[in-house]
Structures are given as structure tokens and as C-alpha cells.
């Protein structure tokens, strides 16, 4: 018995400690700590998914590669002034952008009020006069912004329902609405997956709306970042110059920014014959068809 208890005592530190749990209208939410990391998890049908992790030692280093990758948008728009972020999570992306660009106006759209509260209580996210969280569906918010002819020069699409991106935020109609609120010199940064049954469909949909775009993938991450804008994409040389200028600011976040330009590709690596996603033809249809 003593040996068994001793063994359990040794195993306990290896398990993540749950410091918060709640069920929101949209999902089950858990906050855990383990090995100096605090993580936000959404509990979904296919298992728990880390949405955000931070280091608890006060370090500003970002934990996940995909979070670091999202800042590749700065290669296309180095000094954003008006930012829209769809999806809050733990608030890492808006927090870093607010530190890098303290004069930028940042609107964060989060449908789940519980997520916004957890980000504040456990992940040090704070709203300011220039950084505001709007509890709303991102598509509804963007539709209203378009009606008011508002423009953003840095748009991050990072909303996840748990298993995947909400299907109404994958369609041609939605991307056309995003296009309406994108400034002429702005950039769209979309976080999606590099290994997904929707990869080809997503790609042809972005291509239909925006034309050419950059794919950003790393072997260490299952995510891909889509980068696009209304004007012509910058050349690798221009992006290398911007990377050199911004690297000193990004170094403390552990972002290997100098290496990013050469990893962006505009090569078509998807099946061009795949069907464009629309409000009438969505991922739920694909799941039924496969």
C-alpha cells in the first residue's frame, strides 16, 4: 500500500492541474496548469483542444507555433492602425499586437462571454480604450461594419468552435463580407489547418474571393496561415526587408521572424476542381458526403 501511494504521489505532478472549469452556452471550458504552462481548453466531441497556452513565469515568449505564425501578416502590413480579430481565445494575439503597436485600435469579436471572462481572469487579458472585446458573432459584426463602411488594415480570422472553424465563416459569402471591410492596403490573416478534408475547398474559396494568396506552413505545426490582400502580394525581397526591420521587436516573443519570408508560398498545392464553399454548400454537407 505504501509503495502504491508513493507511486501515485510521483505521478501526480505529471498530470495537469485543473484550476477552472465551466460550461458555457457554446462549449465546456477548462483551464489547466502543467510544467510551467497555463492552458485554455475547449472540450469537444473529438477530445480536448488547447486554444491558448501561456508560460506562468512571466515570460512573453509565445507557446504555440501557430500563434507565432499569425504574426506573419506583418510582412504584408508592417504597421497596422486598425485591427479586427475574430476569436479571442486567451487573448494572446490582441495582447501582443497592442504591445507592438500601442496606438493601434483593436476590435476583438468573441461570441462566448465565458471565454472573454476566462481570458481576463486567467490569461491577463485586459481591455483598454483602444482594445475592445465585442460579444457577438463575428459574421454579424463584420456585416454591420460593412454597412457602416468601416475599414480595417489587419484582419485576423481565428475563430474556432472546438472541432473546426465555424462553417458560416468558411464560405464565399463570408469572405466577400470580410473583403468589404478590408482597407486597400490591408491584410487578411486566416488561421486554418494544413491537414484537413476541407483544405482544397478552403483554398479554392479564398482564391475565388481574393485571387492569389500566400500559404504559410511549418513542419512543426498542423496549422496553416493564409495571407492575402487586395493589392499585389509583396515580393520575397520586400518581405525580407520588413522581417529584418521588425525582428528586434518580435524577438522577446520567441517569433523567428527572419525565417518566415522564405516559408511563404503562392504555389497552388490544392485541387482546383474542388467546389467552392458557400452558404448553401458548407462543411456539414461535406461531412455527410464523405
Feature map (PLM): residue ranges:
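C-terminal segment of classical bacterial N-terminal signal peptides
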Residues: 8-13
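Acidic/histidine-rich helix-loop elements
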Residues: 44-60, 164
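Short, glycine/acidic-rich beta->alpha junctions
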Residues: 23, 89, 197-198
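C-terminal substrate-binding/active-site "lid" region of AdoMet-derived donor-dependent transferases
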Residues: 172-237
Amino acid at each position: 500500500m505504501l509503495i502504491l501511494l508513493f507511486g501515485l504521489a510521483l505521478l501526480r505532478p505529471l498530470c495537469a492541474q485543473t484550476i477552472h472549469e465551466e460550461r458555457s452556452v457554446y462549449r465546456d471550458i477548462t483551464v489547466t496548469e502543467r510544467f510551467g504552462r497555463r492552458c485554455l481548453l475547449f472540450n469537444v466531441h473529438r477530445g480536448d483542444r488547447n486554444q491558448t497556452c501561456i508560460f506562468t513565469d512571466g515570460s512573453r515568449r509565445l507557446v504555440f507555433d501557430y500563434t507565432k505564425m499569425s504574426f506573419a501578416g506583418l510582412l504584408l502590413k508592417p504597421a497596422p492602425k486598425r485591427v479586427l480579430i475574430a476569436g479571442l481565445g486567451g487573448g494572446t494575439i490582441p495582447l501582443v499586437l497592442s504591445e507592438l503597436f500601442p496606438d493601434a485600435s483593436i476590435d476583438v469579436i468573441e461570441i462566448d462571454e465565458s471565454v472573454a471572462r476566462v481570458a481576463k481572469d486567467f490569461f491577463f487579458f485586459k481591455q483598454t480604450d483602444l482594445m475592445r472585446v465585442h460579444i457577438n458573432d463575428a459574421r454579424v459584426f463584420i456585416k454591420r461594419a460593412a454597412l457602416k463602411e468601416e475599414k480595417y488594415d489587419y484582419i485576423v480570422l481565428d475563430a474556432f468552435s472546438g472541432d473546426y472553424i465555424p462553417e458560416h465563416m468558411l464560405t464565399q459569402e463570408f469572405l466577400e463580407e470580410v473583403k468589404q471591410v478590408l482597407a486597400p492596403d490591408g491584410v487578411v490573416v486566416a488561421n486554418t489547418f494544413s491537414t484537413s478534408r476541407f483544405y482544397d475547398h478552403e483554398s479554392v474559396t479564398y482564391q475565388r474571393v481574393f485571387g492569389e494568396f500566400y500559404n504559410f506552413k511549418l513542419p512543426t505545426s498542423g496549422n496553416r496561415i493564409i495571407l492575402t490582400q487586395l493589392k499585389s502580394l509583396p515580393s520575397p525581397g520586400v518581405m525580407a526587408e520588413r522581417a529584418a526591420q521588425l525582428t528586434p521587436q518580435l524577438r522577446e516573443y520567441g517569433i523567428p521572424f527572419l525565417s518566415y519570408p522564405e516559408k511563404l508560398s503562392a504555389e497552388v498545392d490544392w485541387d482546383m476542381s474542388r467546389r467552392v464553399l458557400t452558404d448553401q454548400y458548407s462543411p456539414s454537407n461535406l461531412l455527410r458526403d464523405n
